């Protein structure tokens, strides 16, 4: 599919480029915030699996848009974005190229907050899907649990955690694990997420770890007496019903039909970069 046809087919894809977002996923976080007020009172925020940076862009624009420039630097909202892949810089965001499963990552993140806990942790991480749904769901669950394990080590009591999930037949077990640490767990589907996709987001509110919980990245989720561990999370649709439908096709204005918009930020180190270079040099057919 060429860029022009995708511009015409996917309203959010084109809208993201028009508004300067690095990816259409920016609208998912915006719609989640409309529903849950995620950014209210957030001063220290962590974006895990952040590349290419659209969620970090949203955090920067929303948290810093009305900030008085005269206030002290340590009183301004602080945003730390973490990913294994390098990221192009974003205003107001500290980008770290780190592994979220490595024990040292925790101390590095906290050092940027002056060793103070975070108010909000978000994660839009997902694997490269294989088409084998059971395998994709399993890998996605492992990414989520890695993000969750780091989140419970950096969050303050009452903090919030948002992460992508693939809803499968065993998703209620995942909700139960999350519910052990948060008083409220919801499953949300932004309008900008295609209805044909099994993608949704868990929104965990009011972080409330057990009294005997000791944060430790080397012992993931080694807590607790799992009493009342069965949990059915409410499913919430987010986004204005008058907005664009992610599964619909919309016409493009006549004067725009031949116009394509460049991406806001090309990938900094894509795995296919060397293959493209070889193809351009005619060394690979």
From Swiss-Prot:
Binding-site list for S-adenosyl-L-methionine: 53, 55, 83, 99, 124
Keywords: Cytoplasm, Methyltransferase, S-adenosyl-L-methionine, Transferase, tRNA processing
GO molecular function annotation: S-adenosyl-L-methionine binding; tRNA (cytidine(32)/guanosine(34)-2'-O)-methyltransferase activity; tRNA (guanine) methyltransferase activity; tRNA 2'-O-methyltransferase activity; tRNA methyltransferase activity
Keyword Endoplasmic reticulum attributed: no
Subcellular location: Cytoplasm
Protein name as it appears in the record: tRNA (cytidine(32)/guanosine(34)-2'-O)-methyltransferase
Function: Methylates the 2'-O-ribose of nucleotides at positions 32 and 34 of the tRNA anticodon loop of substrate tRNAs. Requires trm732 for methylation of the cytidine at position 32 of the anticodon loop of substrate tRNAs. Requires trm734 for methylation of the nucleotide at position 34 of the anticodon loop of substrate tRNAs. Methylates tRNA(Phe).
Entry EC number(s): 2.1.1.205
Entries under CDD domains matching the protein: AdoMet_MTases
Keyword hit for Transferase: yes
Family to which this protein belongs: Belongs to the class I-like SAM-binding methyltransferase superfamily. RNA methyltransferase RlmE family. TRM7 subfamily.
Pfam families, per the entry: FtsJ (PF01728)
GO BP, one annotated term: cytoplasmic translation
Phenotype upon loss of function: Loss of methylation of the 2'-O-ribose of cytidine at position 32 and guanosine at position 34 of the tRNA anticodon loop of tRNA(Phe). Increases occurrence of 1-methylguanosine residue at position 37 in the tRNA anticodon loop of tRNA(Phe) and decreases occurrence of wybutosine at this position. Leads to activation of the general amino acid control (GAAC) response. Slow cell population growth. Abolishes spore germination.
């Amino acid at each position: 599919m060429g860029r022009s046809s995708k511009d015409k087919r996917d309203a959010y894809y084109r809208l993201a480029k028009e508004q300067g977002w690095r990816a259409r996923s920016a609208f998912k976080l915006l719609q989640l915030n409309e529903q849950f007020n995620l950014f209210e009172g957030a001063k220290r925020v962590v974006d895990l699996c952040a590349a290419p940076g659209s969620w970090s862009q949203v955090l920067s624009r929303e948290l810093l848009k009305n900030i008085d420039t005269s206030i002290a630097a340590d009183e301004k909202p602080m945003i730390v974005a973490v990913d294994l892949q390098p990221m192009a810089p974003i205003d107001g965001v500290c980008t770290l190229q780190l592994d979220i499963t490595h024990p040292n990552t925790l101390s590095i993140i906290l050092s940027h907050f002056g060793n103070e806990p975070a108010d909000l942790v978000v994660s839009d991480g997902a694997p490269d899907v294989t088409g084998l749904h059971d395998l994709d769901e399993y890998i996605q669950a492992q990414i989520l649990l890695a993000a969750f394990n780091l989140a419970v080590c950096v969050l303050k009591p009452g903090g919030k955690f948002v992460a992508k999930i693939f809803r499968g037949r065993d998703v209620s077990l995942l909700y139960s694990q999350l519910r052990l640490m948060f008083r409220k767990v919801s499953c949300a589907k932004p309008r900008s997420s295609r209805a044909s996709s099994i993608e949704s987001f868990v929104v965990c509110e009011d972080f409330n770890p057990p009294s005997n919980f000791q944060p430790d990245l080397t012992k993931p989720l080694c807590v607790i007496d799992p009493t009342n561990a069965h949990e059915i999370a409410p499913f919430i649709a987010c986004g204005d019903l008058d907005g664009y439908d992610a599964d619909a096709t919309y016409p493009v204005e006549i004067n725009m039909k031949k116009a394509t918009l460049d991406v806001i930020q090309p990938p900094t180190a894509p795995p296919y970069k060397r293959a493209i270079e070889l193809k351009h040099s005619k060394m690979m057919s």
